[in-house]
Amino acid sequence: MPNYRKLGKLPPKRHIKLDRPQGESHLGEGIYYEHILTTVGFDRAYSIMYHLRPPTRVRAVERAGEVKLEPAEEMPLRHVHLRTADLQRQGDAITGRIPLMFNDDLVAYRCRPAAPQETLYRNGAADEVIFIQSRGGTAETTFGRLRYRRGDYLVMPRTTVYRLIPDDLGQEDYLFLEARGVIRTPARYSNPDGQFLLGTPYSERDFHSPTELNPVDDARDTVLLVKVGTRLTRMTLAQHPLDVVGWDGFVYPYTFNAWDFEPLTGTVHLPPPFQQTFECDGFVICTFAPRYLDHHPEAIKVPYAHSNVQADEVLFYVEGDFASRRGVGECSLT
């Protein structure tokens, strides 16, 4: 995320006490409990949170299964069109994910849940991009409550505890991307001061972080489902983990809406990098938003044939018509 945010109660400096009335505090210690979330070791962005209770207390740990990534049978090299609009609803926003494609850099899932997400979830080893295909809802997270709507990219940094609460369960529809690296905006979009350049396809105003903290003061055991790689672990914590009273930093969940993307056009066809939205280790995410087609008087208003031999290209169709494809529909993947 491009800039610093803060929410809730904070002490004036890092690593000093944030006092609270001793009668209200855990074991009468009179403090809130500092918790630092770092990325890339200690070398990149981080955030500092303050909990009602120590976030380290775990009552029990048990295996909870595995997400199996089984490659399809060996087949001839060919184009693929997956129609996913009518996938049968199953599970919840976590257990209902169906893996469709994967490599060493990411896993792509479709998810049309049949049940509400009851158990809190944390991906311990991957950033997640959750594209909201239908309706909206609220994400309850370590960093507070965050509204999402149709067309949002909901970016969830690794280790964030969250639960998705849709406005209409019957319309809940997601595309999940699970990333080995850190999801970020393209470096070329920012000036040396960290601000988006004029002329980039979005600005800081288009990114939305949690605006409301609702710390849960609950000392009862709470179940948390944790995913690391393909392995699932069920942890029983000694308190509710969404008990943060304040945080600040550069790591937090946020939304960016595809309809806020400001597409670039040219006299002739521009290649996909001009529509780039995010980057990560080994892949990029582009948004092909509605835009004027090429306006050179002799322009051929369809993309030229090209061989992108060092990358796989996957398109997810949200709505509308796409100039270079026929026969696709909403929620098609090619």
Q: Language-model segments: which ranges?
A:
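Jelly-roll (double-stranded beta-helix
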Residues: 1-334
